[in-house]
From Swiss-Prot:
InterPro entries: Thioredoxin-like_sf
Pfam family, one: Thioredoxin_6
Glycan-linked positions: N100
This protein's name: Endoplasmic reticulum resident protein 27
Organism field: Homo sapiens
Length: 273
């Protein structure tokens, strides 16, 4: 199948026009519950830092040689804005060396693709709350990442080029149970496939559903997509099970693709979404 450059970043193009408003809305979300952490965790040695990173899906750590720079209080201010992210700080020289840090740096660590993303040098010098919020929001990919105009950028920046989408209405009675099984399946493909949730109850996600030629009556459904060559496949499913997800993903990874999708792609003119 011939890849279409105009569709190579199809998810990104679908929602780019809405990005600015969504970013502003997302970064305002915070957790005010009594259990919310108030301060980053101090990481005093390498084992503590390694354990801290390994224990969470997304960790943001400030590696500082100077605690008087503006980036330090800005990092502190992020803790309540992102309750799904673990925050830490370290000034220990051995810790900085272990993570190849040579100056004041804020790093985001992701379990899903084992990535370390750094803000350093000029980025740290010019950092403000809005910039740091955007950096965290874009790059906070979890074992299952909800699709929106912000996370789509991080999804396509990942080294993992195969995306599995569960397209389902979050308001449905079956959502919680299906999501639990979907999350279990995601662990089986860590490092190979990014697992994504698309809420079909949101009007703005309609273009994603139509891209995969799915009808409302076929939902919930799984859709798998390879960013490198635009190949994709779908599997309408009344119930999400670990076995169904595993078989579907294994089939795609082994090169199996529904014949009707290949034929449809060959007949359909390539259009920019």
């Amino acid at each position: 199948m011939e890849a279409a450059p105009s569709r190579f970043m199809f998810l990104l193009f679908l929602l780019t026009c809405e990005l600015a408003a969504e970013v502003a809305a997302e970064v305002e979300k915070s957790s005010d519950g009594p259990g919310a952490a108030q301060e980053p965790t101090w990481l005093t040695d390498v084992p503590a830092a390694m354990e801290f990173i390994a224990a969470t899906e997304v960790a943001v750590i400030g590696f500082f040689q100077d605690l008087e720079i503006p980036a330090v209080p800005i990092l502190h201010s992020m803790v309540q804005k992102f309750p799904g992210v673990s925050f830490g700080i370290s000034t220990d020289s051995e810790v900085l060396t272990h993570y190849n840090i040579t100056g004041n740096t804020i790093c985001l660590f992701r379990l899903v693709d084992n990535e370390q993303l750094n803000l350093e040098d000029e980025d740290i010098e010019s950092i403000d709350a809005t910039k740091l919020s955007r950096f965290i929001e874009i790059n906070s990919l979890h074992m299952v990442t909800e699709y929106n105009p912000v996370t789509v950028i991080g999804l396509f920046n990942s080294v993992i080029q195969i995306h599995l989408l569960l397209i389902m209405n979050k308001a449905s009675p079956e959502y919680e149970e299906n999501m639990h099984r979907y999350q279990k399946a995601a662990k089986l493909f860590q490092g190979k496939i990014l697992f994504i949730l698309v809420d079909s109850g949101m009007k703005e996600n309609g273009k994603v559903i139509s891209f995969f030629k799915l009808k409302e009556s076929q939902l919930p459904a799984l859709a798998i997509y390879q960013t490198l060559d635009d190949e994709w496949d779908t599997l309408p499913t009344a119930e999400v099970s670990v076995e169904h997800v595993q078989n579907f993903c294994d089939g795609f990874l082994s090169g199996k693709l529904l014949k009707e999708n290949r034929e449809s792609e060959g007949k359909t003119p390539k259009v920019e979404l």
